[in-house]
């Protein structure tokens, strides 16, 4: 009986803070979030996709201060598969990215070389930013934030 009370006490101590934290979603819009764009090159087009992606990467770095991380990685199980991983400072940074002329030129050049291009958003992204990405015609899945935090890296 004492053992049962001990277990119940432990459960109460450890589940209450988790439940409280689980109710604290981040506000959509002003917080950092992740976008993953998955690309699959047509046979024989991977090198051209890499070259075009390298060129736009430099332009995004130079012109988008709200893009905190921008990496292009190869799928380890498929030499024609790639993924952009992007961390945005906030939803406004995504809106700037979507309106970047260099991004538009990249998408126009790379799209004919692909047989797949999808996007996934993870986090507290504003409804306007999600709608703007979907308006590009890119199949997009948004995984809305349920709980968590964004560390302040300014201090």
Label every model-predicted segment:
Residues 1-3:
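N-terminal secretory signal peptides that target proteins for export/translocation
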Residues 5-6, 98:
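Hydrophobic alpha-helical segments, especially transmembrane helices
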Residues 21-82, 89-99, 113-155:
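Short S/T/G/P-rich N-terminal loop/turn motif that feeds into the first structured element of a domain
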Residues 105-110:
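Amphipathic alpha-helical coiled-coil segments
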Residues 7-17:
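Bacterial N-terminal signal peptides
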């Amino acid at each position: 009986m004492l053992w049962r009370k001990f277990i119940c006490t432990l459960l109460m101590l450890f589940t209450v803070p988790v439940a409280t934290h689980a109710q604290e979603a981040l506000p959509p819009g002003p917080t950092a979030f992740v976008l993953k764009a998955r690309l699959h090159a047509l046979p024989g087009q991977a090198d051209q996709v890499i070259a075009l992606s390298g060129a736009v990467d430099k332009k995004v770095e130079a012109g988008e201060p709200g893009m905190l991380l921008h990496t292009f990685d190869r799928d380890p199980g498929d030499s024609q598969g790639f993924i952009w991983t992007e961390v945005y400072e906030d939803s406004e940074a995504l809106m700037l990215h979507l309106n970047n002329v260099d991004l538009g030129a990249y998408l126009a050049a790379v799209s004919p070389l692909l047989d797949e291009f999808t996007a996934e958003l993870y986090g507290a992204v504003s409804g306007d930013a999600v709608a703007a990405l979907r308006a590009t015609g890119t199949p997009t899945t948004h995984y809305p934030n349920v709980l968590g935090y964004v560390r302040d890296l300014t201090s």
